[in-house]
Amino acid sequence: MNAQDLKTIAVIGAGAMGQQIAMNTAINGRKLGYNVILCDSFEKAVEKASAWADTYLKGRVEKGRLTAEEADFVKQHLTITSDVDGAAAKADFIIEAIIEDLKVKRELFQRISRICKPDAILSTNSSNIVSSKLADVTENPSRLLNVHYFNPALVMKLVELVKGPHTSDETIEI
């Protein structure tokens, strides 16, 4: 896999950080044709994220930061759903942005690593939990790393990539 093969990006966790990561990816990835899936197992979080996305895009258009056509493109390429397994199965790159609880993260990574494509890249947005604490529950730890967005993710231009001892050089290069 190379960077051109990345077509579908899934962000798991529709809290404030997950929403911003997904929107940032959808807006900045539109020139690359990314499809972005923001998912959360809690329906209430999905509803809030959908409402937030609509409001955010409308505001960007009103301020002249996006054209109406660009906002429509983002809407067409940003799916917000409660189907975490479906999102994981479709994604080429998965960014986990759920609660900072190691047990919950390990359960999620164990589940999604069995569902995702064999060459999918798995990442955690955590700044507190290194990917090496998740590697042993994944099917392919060489495709796992930390991708740490700084808050607020929609404003900050900095994303930290942290390679674990299990992470392949190829994964970092993509």
What are these regions (language model features)?
Residues M1-Y56, I115:
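NAD(P)+-binding Rossmann beta1-loop-alpha1 motif at the extreme N-terminus of oxidoreductases
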Residues K31, E100, P118, N140-P141:
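Short, well-ordered coil loops that connect the C-terminus of an alpha-helix to the N-terminus
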Residues A16, S41-K48, G59-L122, I129-V130:
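Rossmann-like NAD(P)-binding element
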Residues A53, K105, L154-L158:
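N-terminal alpha-helical segment
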Residues N35, H77-T79, R143:
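Conserved beta-strand segments of alpha/beta enzyme cores
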Residues A22-T25, S50-A51, R106-F109, L134-D136:
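Short amphipathic alpha-helical segments
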Residues I121-I174:
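Rossmann-fold dinucleotide-binding core
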